Curated annotation (Swiss-Prot):
GO CC annotations on file: amyloplast; chloroplast
Catalyzed reaction equations: an NDP-alpha-D-glucose + [(1->4)-alpha-D-glucosyl](n) = [(1->4)-alpha-D-glucosyl](n+1) + a ribonucleoside 5'-diphosphate + H(+)
Record protein name field: Granule-bound starch synthase 1, chloroplastic/amyloplastic
CDD domains in the record: GT5_Glycogen_synthase_DULL1-like
Example GO BP: starch biosynthetic process
Organism expressing this protein natively: Pisum sativum
Length: 603
């Protein structure tokens, strides 16, 4: 167990229920707007001004969530989310989005919520707590320091250590796990062992008083929510270092699988690095048919996290079904997950950042009453910016995503050849594996005036594609939940998707999008059948362009609600079933300080 070496010791803890009574927690203390500088290639300012007026009238009766009362605060659950990413401070995919978006909504419902993640950069809004703890990592004793900020009702805790900061400083966006895509740091096991141990100390040693409703340490009656293999040691250390000594007696662990493809498989001999008793070895034991990272017997962090936790979650109901359907989609952990059971809850999204009514990156703000006027404007601006012929009558397809096998960009590249002779344009935006970046970079040469590939990702352009495109294509071989389709639909941008994971749960064929069917999950080669299915589905979607059916699909898309409200309630219900002492249901509250400024990492 870690030891405290800092001077800031916890002093008290309190929470308030809706009647204002305090309750003690048991503690075990250790020693449409437009930018003037942007021009429109189609339509004029007169059309734009009319659109602005219509949108303003349509939205004038809506209420601002910031003006709503926060409701009654209850002392619900004490929740500690642990992950290698937390948006917007650190994010490479859906994991960071979940840890950024779900906790504030749970906090708004009356729960006390903390996230613990590495301090990869000099985050300007996080301050040193002056609390240090010592943990054993491998054969060394390491000292870690905690940084903290309180945002949108959540205690954001960052673990400070050279294993994180010196490795990634100034390059957070793509260097969290390795020097380049597909290559891991050799000491990742030590890095994330340190994270897990520090995360277990944080609720006990940090005296946090940012909230007017809660103060002091979180104490020990908490639920840890571990996310992906990087935090899979949480339940193991909890049992071996704490419960065995009478600490964290009532604490429970929920383990969430965001992507089964990344399991933390390592050499069997590396088990000794984890400083766990031999009784845990069987939970890590794993044999597969691959010679990476080594031949023969291995340890598997995710397997252990699944087996040792109290409840297993994943990020959509259909993905949960896929994980137990067989070893191809369960990636050889299907039998394990089938034995433990699993709960699938669709992710929400940040509808503050992704809203056509407030998006800071687009020139025209709009809603369902003005979408048919706004999108041609935005399409024309996008076409001009990326170098495609400006013509609002041509349907425009967008792709946004990592260029790797999972996301199916290689399938898309081959499918373009089969529909490029249609009246269509396509823009592909993403970064990733070099071989796939090269495939994208030659699209303009192969299909002049029809296709553009951009391998320098930037957030403003992603927003402009989401708003300006008519369709968004998501040809994933597998997709646990997916966020691009959630972002696109509120903008009236219609998804064309493969039928896998969360895409099945969120996109309804003929109602809010078009399904191509499931694709082969093997990533070694492109399956010609998948190429044909994708091309046929794109052609089918293009036939609806400009029709009344298409207009209805657009309105259906914009009517969808993908906020975190409903997922948060489902999470709450499932976590309450863990029956941690003192935990009670929350309220149907509003997020605390929903308009807080965006956080920016400052190297």
């Amino acid at each position: 167990m870690a030891t405290i070496t800092g001077s800031s010791m916890p002093t008290r803890t309190a929470c308030f229920n809706y009647q204002g009574r305090s309750a003690e927690s048991k503690l075990n203390l250790p020693q449409i707007h437009f930018n003037n500088n942007q021009a429109f290639p189609v339509l004029g300012l007169r059309s734009l001004n009319k659109l602005h007026v219509r949108t303003a009238r349509a939205t004038s009766g809506s209420s601002d969530t910031s003006e709503k009362s926060l409701g009654k605060i209850v002392c619900g659950m004490s929740l500690v989310f642990v992950g290698a990413e937390v948006g917007p401070w650190s994010k490479t995919g859906g994991l960071g989005d979940v840890l950024g978006g779900l906790p504030p909504v749970l906090a708004g419902n009356g729960h006390r919520v903390m996230t613990v993640s590495p301090r990869y950069d000099q985050y300007k809004d996080a301050w040193d707590t002056n609390v240090l703890v010592e943990v054993k990592v491998g054969d060394k004793i390491e000292t870690v320091r905690f940084f903290h900020c309180y945002k949108r009702g959540v205690d954001r805790v960052f673990v400070d250590h050279p294993l994180f900061l010196e490795r990634v400083w100034g390059k957070t966006g793509s260097k969290l796990y390795g020097p380049k895509t597909g290559i891991d740091y050799r000491d990742n096991q030590l890095r994330f062992s340190l994270l897990c141990q520090a995360a277990l100390e944080a609720p006990r040693v940090l005296n946090l008083n940012s909230s007017k409703y809660f103060s002091g340490p979180y104490g020990e009656d908490v639920i840890f929510v571990a996310n992906d293999w990087h935090s899979a040691l949480i339940p193991c250390y909890l049992k071996s270092m704490y419960k065995s000594r009478g600490l964290y007696k009532n604490a429970k662990v929920a383990f969430c699988i965001h992507n089964i493809a990344y399991q933390g498989r390592n050499a069997f001999s590396d088990f000794s690095l984890l400083n766990l008793p031999d009784e845990f070895r069987s939970s890590f034991d794993f044999i597969d048919g691959y010679n990476k990272p080594c031949e023969g017997k291995k340890i598997n962090w995710m397997k252990a996290g699944i087996l040792e936790s109290d409840q297993v979650f994943t990020v959509s109901p259909h993905y949960a079904k896929e994980l137990i359907s067989g070893e191809d989609r369960g990636v050889e952990l299907d039998n394990i997950i089938r034995s433990t059971g699993i709960i699938g809850i669709v992710n929400g999204m940040d509808n503050r950042e992704w809203s056509p009514q407030t998006d800071r990156y687009i020139d025209v703000h709009y809603n369902e009453t003005t979408v048919t006027e706004a999108k041609p404007l935005l399409k024309g601006t996008l076409q001009a910016e990326i170098g495609l012929p400006v013509d609002s009558s041509i349907p425009l397809i967008g792709f946004i995503g990592r260029l790797e096998e999972q996301k199916g960009s290689d399938i898309l590249v081959e499918a373009i050849a089969k529909f490029a002779d249609e009246n269509v344009q396509i823009v592909v935006l993403g970064t990733g594996k070099k071989i796939m970046e090269k495939q994208i970079e030659v699209l303009e040469e192969k299909y002049p005036g029809k296709a553009i590939g951009i391998t320098k990702f930037n957030s403003p352009l992603a927003h402009k594609i989401i708003a300006g495109a008519d369709f968004i294509v998501i040809p994933s071989r597998f997709e646990p939940c997916g966020l691009v389709q959630l972002h696109a639909m509120p903008y009236g941008t219609v998804p064309i998707v493969s039928s896998t994971g969360g895409l099945v749960d969120t996109v309804k064929e003929g109602y809010t999008g078009f399904h191509a069917g499931p694709f082969d999950v093997e990533c070694e080669d492109v399956d010609p059948d998948d190429v044909d299915k994708l091309a046929a589905t794109v052609k089918r979607a293009l036939k609806t362009y400009g029709t009344q059916a298409m207009k209805q699909i657009i309105l259906n898309c914009m009517a969808q609600n993908f906020s975190w409200k409903k997922p948060a309630k489902l999470w709450e219900k499932a976590l309450l079933n863990l029956e941690v002492t003192g935990n009670v249901a929350g309220i149907d509250g509003d997020e605390i300080a929903p308009l807080a400024k965006e956080n920016v990492a400052t190297p």
